[in-house]
């Protein structure tokens, strides 16, 4: 450190200034004060002769520390990933504490035991409640029968998208329908029905009293009831002559009985277009209805041999070489057949396209 000594020159007075004794005393007093201050500063410098060198050394050290910090930042960026890998490795396995994933083998075993007993207790409670629930529910009769919709319908033979397309002169186009009908009607063979079921009087419900777990008897529905659509008189079910047979059945509903003792009937017509496209339909049985003797249905557990009644539609005179949309509906009291969102409740729509 370099010190600048103040000038010892006497103070200058302005031009024309008249010298007075008081002014001289004041100037002398200021001069002596400056001299004392300079003497004190020189004494401090003499007492600490290496102060300037120490200050320079401190400044040099600060510069070196700044350079080292800059170099350390560059090196820390390269070694950061290595430190992270070391931390992960110690977390996976710490050989000093013999811990893996921050847990010892003993603590893991204890946790497994706790979870085992917890889930075992939970499973036991759930099983107990399910068992009690099944004790309160009858397997033979549905609990909420009022939520069941009116019966839906299905047809046989099975047809993709409910479109019956075939050529009378090409058996390979309609043979699959014949095979489907023959397979479906095997359970309706007369000999099998006479062996398993009983002959019930028509026109009234077949109500069977007794315990709900008691086996129920079923009424016969013979294949011969379908006459020209039974496959007994015409093995091709009319497909070889362009007069196809289609079978319709209602879905089974436990406890269902047609209201007011009137049987449910079937009616088919052109769904959209010229009504004369279908000029003649024969129904089998001739009443075109599901007889009351097949109701009520008691469920598959007790009504083992129950056979669903059928109604066959024999389309004897249908316009050829064009698609004819057909709608078959169930009709009776309590039957719903106009649900827009479900075309299988009380009705079904299919297409006939018979080529010659």
Swiss-Prot record:
Asked whether the UniProt record includes Transcription among its keywords, one would answer: yes
Tagged with keyword Transmembrane helix:
yes
Q: Name one Pfam family in it.
A: Na_K-ATPase
Q: One GO CC annotation, please?
A: nuclear envelope
Transmembrane segment boundaries: 110-130
Describe tissue expression.
Answer: Expressed in skeletal muscle (at protein level). Expressed during postnatal development in skeletal muscle and heart.
Annotated Acidic residues bias: 33-43, 51-72
Q: Give the membrane topology, semicolon-separated if more than one.
A: Single-pass type II membrane protein
Which of the residues are on side Nuclear? Answer: 1-109
Q: Which residues lie on this side of the membrane: Perinuclear space?
A: 131-356
- Compartments, record wording: Nucleus inner membrane
- What keywords tag this UniProt record? Membrane, Nucleus, Signal-anchor, Transcription, Transcription regulation, Transmembrane, Transmembrane helix
Any coiled-coil ranges, and where? none
In residue numbers, the region (Disordered) covers 26-78
Q: What is its main location?
A: nucleus
For this chain's UniProt record, which GO biological process terms are given? potassium ion transport; regulation of DNA-templated transcription; sodium ion transport
Recorded family membership: Belongs to the X(+)/potassium ATPases subunit beta family.
Q: Which NCBIfam families does the record associate with it?
A: Na_K_ATPase_bet
Quote the subunit structure annotation.
Answer: Associates with a SMAD7-transcriptional complex. Interacts with TOR1AIP1. Does not associate with known Na,K-ATPase alpha-subunits. Interacts with SNW1.
* Function according to Swiss-Prot or TrEMBL: May act as a transcriptional coregulator during muscle development through its interaction with SNW1. Has lost its ancestral function as a Na,K-ATPase beta-subunit.
What is this protein's record name? Protein ATP1B4
